[in-house]
A protein has these predicted regions:
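Conserved Rossmann-like nucleotide-cofactor binding loop
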Residues: 134
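Nucleotide/phosphate-binding catalytic cleft detector across ATP-hydrolyzing
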Residues: 3-128, 139-339
Length: 339
């Protein structure tokens, strides 16, 4: 993403780190082939935990080595989970503070959407919900900082600030144990037959992409092919089930993800001191429809005092919202560094 708001340039490209980590530099070079002019590179990362790397430190070092193949090291600034910047060599020497820093960059930047406090020591409180293809981040923040003690993914998992489920890549048999079928509950086959992307392609929440074959059966990411993938998880195929059967499977998947998100929000919002309320909820990522479903009945807003919903897709546009951590880190760099 580019820091110049007038440029309106963000790009998101899929990259199978666990399969082709040595090709990251080539993918980065491709990503910037149409970018506006830039004078520095702000880096925030995820992917260092991919199982092609022996350790997280190895992952951080390899990612930074690939980055500096494309961009000269003096131009590269690495954002870290303490909110500070480091050079690539410094970040490689302190990998745990550089690893998986994307959520913190986005939360730190998102604080600007909270109103300025009218009374000292009564800063506005908010919660950021970033829903992507693989994970969901739920991070409490205030006008004066990111309000979590978490530094690592395992910290966030234990605090329910990281939900390891997303709207595209999550395996359905790891999400739900059974789905409704012909009036009964049918257990799922423990196979990589379908993912959450298929559920949302079928339900119409995700756009079709016929040229994309990064799916469970390597067939196109279309609604019709999603039908067959969803049918397989209950031992059927697309020709034996009615539309209503596929609807029920897809809706069951969505209901489970809504349930997980609701539990996470209740846990995170429940940590707010008793004399404070979280007034704003900020949504980013391309899975905002899941948050809308979660908030639809109004019970969370009533229970926790949520007054305003801020949708970055509306404020920034779809591409910036989908690439929100990259956009956020570009903005933070432009504001805080002499780039």
């Amino acid at each position: 993403a580019h820091s110049d708001a007038e440029a309106k340039w963000s790009k998101s490209l899929p990259f199978a780190m666990w399969k082709q980590s040595a090709s990251l530099a080539a993918s980065l070079a491709q990503a910037i082939d149409d970018s506006p002019e830039f004078h520095g590179i702000a880096v925030t990362m995820t992917g260092e935990l991919a199982d092609c790397f022996s350790t997280r430190a190895h992952g951080v070092a390899c990612i930074l080595e690939q980055v500096t193949r494309v961009f000269p090291a003096p131009l590269v600034y690495v954002y870290c989970v303490d909110g500070n910047w480091r050079s690539p060599s410094q970040a490689a020497r302190d990998p745990w503070i550089a690893a998986a820093s994307n959520w913190h960059a986005l939360a730190n930047w998102s604080r600007r959407f909270l109103p300025k406090p009218r009374v000292k020591d009564q800063e506005a409180q908010g919660v950021l919900v970033d829903i992507g293809s693989t994970t969901i981040d739920v991070i409490r923040l205030a006008a004066n900082g990111v309000k979590t003690a978490s530094k690592t993914d395992s910290d966030r998992l234990k605090r329910r600030e990281l939900i390891y489920t997303g709207i595209e890549r999550s395996n359905l048999c790891g999400l739900v144990r059974s789905v409704p079928l012909h009036g009964k509950r049918c257990p799922l086959m423990n196979e990589q037959f379908a993912t959450t992307r298929d559920a949302y392609l079928w339900l119409g929440f995700l756009d079709e992409c016929p040229e994309d074959k990064d799916t469970a059966d390597s067939q196109p990411a279309t609604r019709e092919h999603a039908r067959f993938r969803l049918a397989r998880i209950v031992g059927e195929d697309g020709s034996t089930l009615a539309d209503s059967d596929i609807d029920a499977i897809g809706q069951c998947v969505m209901n489970q993800q809504v349930k997980l998100l609701r539990k996470s929000l209740e846990k995170v919002l429940g940590k707010v001191p008793g004399d404070r309320q979280v007034s704003h909820i900020i949504s980013s990522g391309h899975g905002g429809f899941l948050l809308r479903q979660t908030l639809e009945d109004g019970s969370l807003a009533q229970r926790f005092g949520l007054q305003e919903q801020i949708w970055l897709e509306d404020r920034l546009g779809q591409e910036h919202s989908r690439s929100a951590p990259a956009y956020a880190v570009s903005q933070l760099a432009a504001e805080n560094l002499q780039v």
